Amino acid sequence: DVMSPLIRNLGAMLVKGATPVEVLKQYMAKGDSPTRGRELNIHFGDIGEAEKTRGFLGQISPLGDMVPVMAGVTLSFNMRGEDRVGLVYVGDGATSTGAFHEGINFAAVNRCPLVVIVENNGYAYSTPTSKQTLAKQFIDKAIGYGIPGEQADGNDVLAVYDVTKRAVDRARRG
């Protein structure tokens, strides 16, 4: 399976196999960092054949832009008949971007095995949630695309695990 973290999801990258030393070298733009010193952020990934990769895409900064990227990645899983799922993290601000909506719609229509985790930070940069959307909950936006949505308290690790596992299992089933 493949995931695409946000810049705040360093823990997810570590779970997928990135090492603290690797991350520090990346931040310092060292020649032996994952991007060979060409980038001094955590915008690096490791994706390729399922057996040869740690399975995480490098992040890109614009809000919501990884959703259509992951929709395309997961479409390729379907086209090749691979039993793989893609998971993408976005912040609440990303749900107000065109790229987010295009990616969600594309994934839904093509039945891509994609799971989107929306982290509600309460603010997108300096914009409060109340100025972004009139939806009572971000999962309400899923209804418009005909896809299921679940909610969990992000501070409850077990609840997040349970919701994520259900979503991944559902995506894998098609």
Segments predicted by a language model, with ranges:
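Cofactor-binding active-site loop characterized by glycine-rich and histidine/acidic residues
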Residues: 1-110, 128-134, 139, 144-146
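Short internal beta-strands
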Residues: 111, 116-119
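Thiamine diphosphate
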Residues: 118-174
